[in-house]
């Protein structure tokens, strides 16, 4: 499984590059519970932080506790959050992973093609959208301190909503 994750990460990094469009590409993906969600349903007219991840990603596991705190502090102000898994082989790990960490984000089940569709270079990749699906900001990877920029961008987006 880790080999598959490494291969996918390398394949994503080496794939031809196509920039994020001004508007986020529409999608319909399944939740862990098996329900389908489209981009408009996910947005619900709110600023939304989308994160592409997989459960054994060490950088995701470093970032997400901090991102969860940012979400908790801003959800009552209108922030939505959704995480999209990009490694199908790890889908069976997600429910226990989410529960053990206390994460509350809506989690959608993506695929390698989803990673390619959105030109992902690494995980986590965070994309901040306005309520209409316009890309306000994108950030790939995580290093300590990045959460401050994520929070700053969210505050900017919420002040415009």
Residue ranges and their predicted role:
Residues 27-48:
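A short beta-strand-turn-helix
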Residues 128-161:
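Thiol-/selenol-based redox modules, centered on thioredoxin-like
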Residues 15-21:
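Sec/Tat signal peptide C-region and signal peptidase I cleavage site
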Residues 5-15:
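Bacterial N-terminal signal peptides
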Residues 49-50, 81, 126:
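Hydrophobic beta-strand anchors of alpha/beta hydrolase catalytic cores
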